[in-house]
Amino acid sequence: MPVNSRREQGKDAAVQGTNDSSVVSKVSAAAQGYFHDDFLKHFVCKVSRRAPLINRGYYVRWKAVDHCLKQFFHATQSCSRRQILSLGAGFDSLYFRLHAEGALGGVTVFEVDFPEVARRKAALINSNTCLKDTLPDRETVSNQQTNAVFIRSGHYNLIGVDVRKEQQVEVTLSAAGLQWDAPTLVLSEVVLTYMETQWSDAVIGWAAKLLPQSVFVMYEQIHPDDPFGRVMQNHFLKLNSTIHALKQYPDTVAQTQRFIQKGWEKCVCMDMNQFYFDLLLEEERQRVEGLEPFDEFEIFGIMLSSIPHMTPQWAERPPLVIQPMCRSPSIEVVGMASALLAPGIILLTGGCGRSGRDTVARVLIKEKDGWKCACVEAHGDQVVGLYQTLTSIPGGGAVLFGGRTSPLNPTDSVVCVTSDPSNEQSQSAVQLSFKNMVCTGTGPKPRWRHTSTLICYKDKTFLFVFGGRTEKDPVLSDAHFLCLEDKHWTEMTVVGAVPEARHSHSACPYGGGLVIFGGLGKGGRPLCDAFYLRPTSSGFCWETKNLHPPPVPRYSHSAHVVNEKMVVVGGVWLQADGVPGVAVINLSTGSCVEIQLDTSSVPWPLMLHSFCSELLDSEGSEMVLIGGGGNCFSFGTHLNLHPITVDLRPILCNSY
């Protein structure tokens, strides 16, 4: 099949452009100390700093490939001749880094890429003293019109040939000195996926056939149909760099079968969450997590994909139907806080939108024919931040606590929000008073991603603050009681085993106390436990709720208790099948079922994390989900466009 049409050449050029973007991101990660590589910087014009999320993503990618290389070196250390065949190598510095580490030994590196990419790389190497000094025996081929070998040396060979042209690749590699029977690591780092699937399958097949003593290391995307996957695919479509294999091989199982069917005896497929948590030492994860301020845990977990060892036990019931809120305004914000001021009136504060931190509080108001959004004319000390809490209090007001303006600047302010009866309300704006509450006693340290829950105890009203994180503490487990009548942080007697430290969890009023569920725990591992803070005559007691079957661990979800059922919506989990829908937990019996969401009526990829939610009626039969989304790695920012509603009646009417 011909692969040199004008249209294909345009696509090839677009794919080559992904190399330039990738190497800039790798240089950024190296410059921030994620990994050591003094040679990458020689392949870019200048060092640019990428966002922490991108740096972490490229670190995991680099570390995973490096792990496979070291395993290969160890397994073949007794062999006199070993080879690395890097397909679509681009401006990778693999050879130069390994040479500097003294890790090559008897290893020869063969790099293959499009002729134009190889030509540019050869020119960079030949013009850079640091690079060419590592190749004292190099031979630069002058006539590159007739010879696909651009640089030849004893341990490094740079070849410019289209890997889809099997016969040409075979002839050129043989001419460059590749020994087909020698132990060889074939490396494809986000390369084959840009080819039409029949071509990438052919490459996997000929590698198995021609290199009988080889291992094939492939780093590639999976999960095309979840919201992140849809955003990622749209990004590459805009770049004219379609990801092809993703549709036919959407998960680790399909990729495993692919390699077996193409002639490989064994295939081990591991996603990057599994690699990050199971193969990296905790000390190394702590080192990396301390390099830069970071607060994008949802997208980081989604980006690394899924741990396939735990599958949700979906209930054999129809998915819950969700749909955009009737005549709802556009609210594209993540990390907001919400509170129900009165039936049909929802206050929204804080968060981050497309233009940065959202400085405008707003109110959603239910009318006869739909919902409208009114701006808030704030009087007093409004606090702007992300991941603050806003808790409804008796009388129609709310209390705002904590949050952050940046990962280095959290707050511990307590702000009382009340309506201002002295001012007339207009159709387009609502008058609210934001007043800092001066509190006595020892309060919690500044934090965000915590929970604040209203508890009534012995004729007093308390705001119960639990968990979260600070700029120095990755997770917190302390608990604090603020008496709203006395404006005093009160010491209360609490017995029982304290829940594990966490953030991005949920806490719901229940049984005179509250119930906490899930969150992100120590070391970045999602949790699936539930704890009941039960009132006693002398204070409170923590009790563990035994759930069966255990729900899939998750964080950045939302939850509400309706009667004896805790309804957990959305969030992020690190497992293979789909994305979180609704978990229904019976707090009396401990039974738990997972129910999927039918998102077919929502015309955009629905990302249910970093969002807020409220029940819309006293029976709890309908829930509204507002905001949510985030930065999708280097693929752009995706924010949910409109609030959506979930009809909870099917699950409330059933006995789970």
Language model features: what each stretch is:
Residues M1-I159, E166-Q167, S174-D181:
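Rossmann-like AdoMet
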Residues Q83, T108, P183-L185, V215, ...:
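Structural motif
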Residues G88, V186-T193:
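Short catalytic micro-motifs in class I SAM-dependent methyltransferases
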Residues P115-V117, L131-L135, N143, L158-V171, ...:
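Conserved, structured regulatory domains from eukaryotic proteins
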Residues R164-L173, Y194-P212:
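A short, conserved alpha-helix within the catalytic core of class I
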Residues L185-L187, W206-D225:
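Conserved beta-strand signature within the Rossmann-like core of class I S-adenosyl-L-methionine
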Residues F228-M325:
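Rossmann-like AdoMet/SAM-dependent catalytic core
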Residues M310-Y656:
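Kelch-like beta-propeller repeat domains
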